[in-house]
Amino acid sequence: MNKAYYIGLMSGTSMDGVDAVLVDFAGEQPQLIGTHTETIPTHLLKGLQRLCLPGTDEINRLGRLDRSVGKLFALAVNNLLAKTKIAKDEIIAIGSHGQTVRHMPNLEVGFTLQIGDPNTIATETGIDVIADFRRKDIALGGQGAPLVPAFHQQTFAQVGKKRVILNIGGIANITYLPGNSEEVLGFDTGPGNTLIDAWVQQVKNESYDKNGAWAASGKTDPQLLAQLLSHPYFSLAYPKSTGRELFNQAWLEQQLSAFNQLNEEDIQSTLLDLTCHSIAQDILKLAQEGELFVCGGGAFNAELMQRLAALLPGYRIDTTSALGVDPKWAEGIAFAWLAMRYQLGLPANLPAVTGASREAILGGRFSAK
């Protein structure tokens, strides 16, 4: 059978590494051929975190990081190919998400900015790169996010089955697949892992709360939870999208200023509940019952999954592996899929999801030649 090899590159708001996946799209379902995660070096991570907040000398820092992130993404590709022993000329294209450093779609002139120079990736891998997927949607009046619902629709939708696909990265987003002729919907619910990771990093110097064990040892403070949930984002109507611009360490410190008496683990438990409650509220607005399939890093947090299940008694909950897609690599696969859509000249946004005025072919090609 012919092969249709694409590589997907993803680094999300969690900034916990660059995921590189090699996918074959020749069959009906995407087939995952190989995976690799490239760790983001500490100096680069600190530079990126700093760039996500307004500061001085931004353009110089942006320019340097754009190239450095491009080199890191290229390294991820080259290591993936070495691992899978597949030659670069067998790859049709790389789909690169880049690293988001600003996402401001709701300004009078909205914009989004991802860095990781695709020219650098193309020249250092010898493979054409499809990148800059979000800005066409914004040019058409959309949010530029989330982009994965179109992939979810094609891969996970089934007639007669009401399904919600929940991706929990730094930010959490949901795709509602009604299983009938109703529109597919999708939007960011709010924080996923970003605040629980930030707090465990600040207090315990650990990169994440494994299995939610630290949160499980604490007790949620109802007053703090109510205050966090009063953030205006949670009551916005969709289409909506968010990022570190709204939910970051500075915002968290501001929220915690009146709660100095709380134990650190109680704060962690409350932050985990913020993620779970904001997700559950949005899911219940769409449908009281159905099937929920989780992907992204949050799928591996046992305490999070347990709390979600308690808030959504009408849902059968599993990870996307039950549908044949490894939850760790689902987003990387989605960006390989977006590259394929560009290659085939097919649209990849869902206007009902992003708010764009029409469907569009997303991205641009950066040739290796």
Swiss-Prot record:
NCBIfam families: PRK09585.1-3, PRK09585.3-2. It comes from Shewanella oneidensis (strain ATCC 700550 / JCM 31522 / CIP 106686 / LMG 19005 / NCIMB 14063 / MR-1). Catalyzes the specific phosphorylation of 1,6-anhydro-N-acetylmuramic acid (anhMurNAc) with the simultaneous cleavage of the 1,6-anhydro ring, generating MurNAc-6-P. Is required for the utilization of anhMurNAc either imported from the medium or derived from its own cell wall murein, and thus plays a role in cell wall recycling. One of its GO terms (biological process) is amino sugar metabolic process. Its EC number is 2.7.1.170. This is Anhydro-N-acetylmuramic acid kinase. SUPFAM superfamilies: Actin-like ATPase domain. It catalyses: 1,6-anhydro-N-acetyl-beta-muramate + ATP + H2O = N-acetyl-D-muramate 6-phosphate + ADP + H(+). GO terms for molecular function: ATP binding; kinase activity; phosphotransferase activity, alcohol group as acceptor. InterPro entries: Anhydro_N_Ac-Mur_kinase, ATPase_NBD. Belongs to the anhydro-N-acetylmuramic acid kinase family.
